[in-house]
Amino acid sequence: MTGISFHLSPSEAATRSAAASFAQNVLRPSRATYLSHSSHPARFQATRPTYATAVSSSLIKSQLSPALGGTGGSLVEAALLVEECYAVEPSAALTIFATGLGLTPLNIAGDPAHAEFLAPFLSGEGAPLASLVFSEPGGVANALEKGGAGFQTTARREGDEWVVDGEKMWATNCAGWDFKGCELACVVCRDVTDGEEYGGDPRDKVMIVLVTRGDLERNGEGSFEVVRHVEMPGHSSVSGPHVRYNRVRVPAKNVLCPPGQGAQVAFGSFDASAVLVGAMGVGVMRAAFDAALAFAKRDARGGAVPLLERQAFADLLSGIKMQAEAARALTWKAAHALENGPGDYDARRELALAAKIYSSEAAVKACTDAINAVGVTAYDLDQPFSDLLNTAIVLPIFDGGNVGIRRRHMQELMLSPTYDAWASTFGPSK
């Protein structure tokens, strides 16, 4: 995608076509399989064959940059992939994309020296999971506030090793398929080598430590445990449990980001994922629109004409369509701008934040509008609407909640003395 054109390039069109095929032929059938299980953990484990197909189809390798041996393309292509998958089967898709988020810190800060950590994800074999282990049971929205408690998961230097201690929650894939740890966890933690008390900028102490499944096995039983599996109303095959690291020792080479660099890389990872959450929202809106449109064409609710000829129904449906188109345009623009500009990084980042906030909140409204249009029939579980709503309601509150994190980051940008409001569209004003 270049200039102002919205025509997909041959590469982008091929990505979309391949994604649509994968969604229909691999993701869609997985739903019936995992829904046959009653517990959340069992549903997650039931998606392993689907995930393995994603691995063998290079969907995991494609989430790593070419500089690291991957086949990753542009962020616009990633957004196209995410939309196609979320329009069909969000839950099984999220496990795939969460590994991409787990690998993003390495895309930002990794180098060839990290080849051993990346090898499982480049092989095209098995079902390796990665996770960005960020959130904590008590929340982290204000973890960088001076004078606050900060991240409660800590790392302490002891000789040639770092010792990781603490509890995390909501980190998709972090427990692995057998709940004994994933192949690679990028654990965001606070350096306490010089003690718990620190009066400076909390960012100075934030670091990212790589914890592999091999590290956990070397540390022995009890070093990693699942405290509780979280049952969720949507994304019902996704695993993001409450976990605990108990004095997990890793070698110094496992430090991806030393103290002082971890926050920038962690939030940089979430800048990229913000765009993809925008695409998730578009996928959900698209599914809601398509389902409501199909209903309106075949059902008259006892009247003489199909519902689509009723003004009230058409108004709600056209609203969903307009919001979906607007959200997609913003998402594509944010994806292109984050990698290409114009504007400095803050200007480009603002668009990513806007795409996440607008699209995620619009997706919730689109689902409720579709439900209101269809009426009580939408409450039937044989209809897709309740599941779509349960999928949508997490989009504004995960991957950095809109209220506690994403809007606050936009506020910080606007408060900056160097804020240049339209630089991401027209370039720097000066």
Describe each region flagged by the PLM:
Residues 28-41, 297, 301, 324-358, ...:
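C-terminal helix-coil-helix/basic helical segment that borders enzyme active sites and/or dimer interfaces
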Residues 8, 224-325:
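Glycine-rich beta->alpha junctions and the first turn(s) of the following alpha-helix
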Residues 169-176, 273-277, 394-401:
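Glycine-rich phosphate/pyrophosphate-binding beta-alpha loops
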Residues 1-95, 419-430:
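Amphipathic, small/basic residue-rich leader segments at the start of a protein or domain
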